[in-house]
Amino acid sequence: MEQAWRWYGPKDPVSLSDIRQAGATGIVTALHHIPNGEIWRIEEIKKRKTEIENAGLSWSVVESVPVHEEIKTQTGNYQKWINNYKQTLRNLAQCGIDTVCYNFMPVLDWTRTDLAYELPDGSKALRFDHIAFAAFELHILKRPDAEKAYNQEEQVAARTYYDKMSAQDITQLTRNIIAGLPGAEEGYTLDEFQTQLDRYKDISSEKFRTHLAYFLNEIVPVAQEVGIKMAIHPDDPPRPILGLPRIVSTIEDMQWFVETQPLPANGFTMCTGSYGVRSDNDLVKMIEQFADRIYFAHLRSTQREDNPLTFHKAAHLEGDVDMFNVVKALLNEEYRRLNQGETRLIPMRPDHGHQMLDDLRKKTNPGYSAIGRLKGLAEFRGLEMALKKVYFNK
């Protein structure tokens, strides 16, 4: 696999030099300074690509070209944003970039309740606390009909949790959930957030699928024409939240996805940490069933807690994800492609490392500190080497 690393551009505390020293060769990045929906101009793409190449690295994957909210709701200027998206793909292809990761999650990108959950060894991780999230929905945001999403026991636990919160706790939880995270291009106040949610009140999962289908049927033929592989990222977490439709969460969703738009350019980002939160998702089966459509891998593991809807980021080779067999399945597909004459390795990046060691004293992007990902990348490099020696180099 191609060892890649997510970089948030010139303002990222982790520099390109740091990344190269970590052993990565590919960069996963985006033009974060361009507003959602606007065209990425060739000169802007080339400027960023040159910056990366001057550091001895290559721009391997775009993550992400954001999908404008009006595309998701099919309102306003959605056709304009789709046309802009097509032009961005053409411009990326002209600059030699061939893989685009994106998501179709409504309103929020990945969501956590705690961005600095302390583990027993003193390192810090991202965490999603189901009851804390319920307290936010029911008692801070006060989302209409939110109680329908929780049983009586959960509602009581959420009330108890909320009653113990200080004003600072409420502010911090709210900020964690709605103020925006790396990769989520927009942040919201509470009122703005509820306004965004209200735009989906009449959009069921079935209707949302028709919106995604329309987007795919507009975009994927262009990607196919210009040689770009589109790799949709799963919902994170992979279940309904905030009354919003979530339609990229299961193997059944993946099957619908490829049947809806069967062109080869229409593929997946295999994010083991997102899909793996659900105990009913068999990651190895997913990889094997859709192997030829996996164009990018996010490798991380999560640990479900006593409440199985609560989870935190585990060490990369620990937790609930069977990383040994996940990586083996990805290598099986990579070798199949190589044997058929393809030369492009599957780009992989270590996702959401723990904040540890010297990074505990630094300001970092949540989930994207250097040392935790350095550790993860080294572990994956070793795992891949061992698997290749035992199973593939015969």
UniProtKB/Swiss-Prot annotation:
- InterPro entries, per database record: Man_deHydtase, Xyl_isomerase-like_sf
Q: Which GO terms describe its biological process?
A: D-glucuronate catabolic process
Under catalytic activity, the entry for this protein gives: D-mannonate = 2-dehydro-3-deoxy-D-gluconate + H2O
Q: Which key words are in the record?
A: Iron, Lyase, Manganese
For whether the record's keyword set contains Lyase, the answer is yes
Which pathway, per its entry? Carbohydrate metabolism; pentose and glucuronate interconversion
| Gene3D superfamilies assigned to the protein according to its UniProt record, in alphabetical order | Divalent-metal-dependent TIM barrel enzymes (3.20.20.150)
Its needed co-factors are: Fe(2+); Mn(2+)
State the superkingdom: Bacteria
E.C. number(s) listed in UniProt: 4.2.1.8
MF term (GO), any: ferrous iron binding
Which top-level enzyme class is recorded in the Swiss-Prot or TrEMBL entry?
Answer: lyase
Which cysteine pairs are joined by S-S bonds? none
- Listed Pfam families: UxuA
Q: Describe its function.
A: Catalyzes the dehydration of D-mannonate.
Spell out the family assignment given in the record's similarity comment.
Answer: Belongs to the mannonate dehydratase family.
Put simply, this protein is called: Mannonate dehydratase
| Lineage per the UniProt record | Bacteria, Pseudomonadati, Pseudomonadota, Gammaproteobacteria, Pasteurellales
